[in-house]
């Protein structure tokens, strides 16, 4: 079973993403901060991560670095309002597998998630 980890501090968006990406063969785990995300990653089994950059307890880019150092096989899609070319290039150069700016289309998000899985 695929396991998606959503790390997004906006509760409404987090819940909406969870609902939109849920499938029979997919488990959704959601966190709203880095601390909870790190605890969840220690449990293992994550197939893909949707990661916001601006979180209440730090930068998602710092967590991205840790993920790519410790579990490089897990695809990470950055999901953020930071939408300048410089932000996008920075996120991809730091190891993100994809970069989606808010606001976004759910159909595009689903397609990008499915491509990474």
Each predicted region: which residue ranges?
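Acidic, metal-coordinating helix/loop segments flanking the phosphotransfer/catalytic sites
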Residues: 30-48
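Two-component/phosphorelay signaling modules centered on CheY-like receiver
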Residues: 10-29
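Active-site residues of response regulator receiver
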Residues: 52, 80
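Conserved acidic carboxylate
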Residues: 8, 55
